Amino acid sequence: MKTETKRPVDLYFDKYQESHNNETNEILHWICVPLIIFSLLGLVWSIPFPYIGFLGKYNGFVNWASFLIAFSVYYYYRLSPVLSYMMLLLIIVMSWGIVSLEQLEKSGGPALWLICVIIFVASWIGQFIGHKIEGKKPSFLDDVKFLLIGPIWLLHFICNKVGIKY
């Protein structure tokens, strides 16, 4: 009789779940994790990137965030292709939001980096409040990989809810 071994992604989810059982903490994660991703992406997007001539009018779409996106989607793909596609879709939507904030900045609004710093700090405060309520330290304090696991941990609940095998 053959026993089924768990995939690495499921082992990560099991470990992550250990410090995410309180309902309030979970709700805060559903709010704060996407905001942290958005703000981190926006902060990296804000770092000046050198002009590359052959990109022409598309220079604004290749920046340091492009490398972060490529790395994270590849990492997620190694864990679960389905979850990586879902993350890529979310990142595309977030990128649209970041480009919109860039346009706002160009028309006299607040700087993209400033908006992202505020969102980033507020979201991490929310995360730590959630873990204080939970009574357990955040998973990433044991292993930094869990900073990348949080977003797909949320997505795997959506997959389970609608019956998508990830």
Where are these regions (language model features)?
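Transmembrane alpha-helical segments that form the membrane-embedded catalytic/substrate-channel core
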Residues: 69-81, 96-100, 119-135, 154-158
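Structural signature of hydrophobic alpha-helical transmembrane segments
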Residues: 51-66, 113-118
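Cytoplasmic-side transmembrane-helix entry/capping segments in multi-pass membrane proteins
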Residues: 84-93, 142-144
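Membrane-proximal soluble regions of multi-pass membrane proteins
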Residues: 1-19, 132-166
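Hydrophobic alpha-helical transmembrane segments
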Residues: 35-42, 95-99, 115-119, 151-161
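Membrane interfacial helix-start motif at the N-side
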Residues: 13-34, 40, 71-83
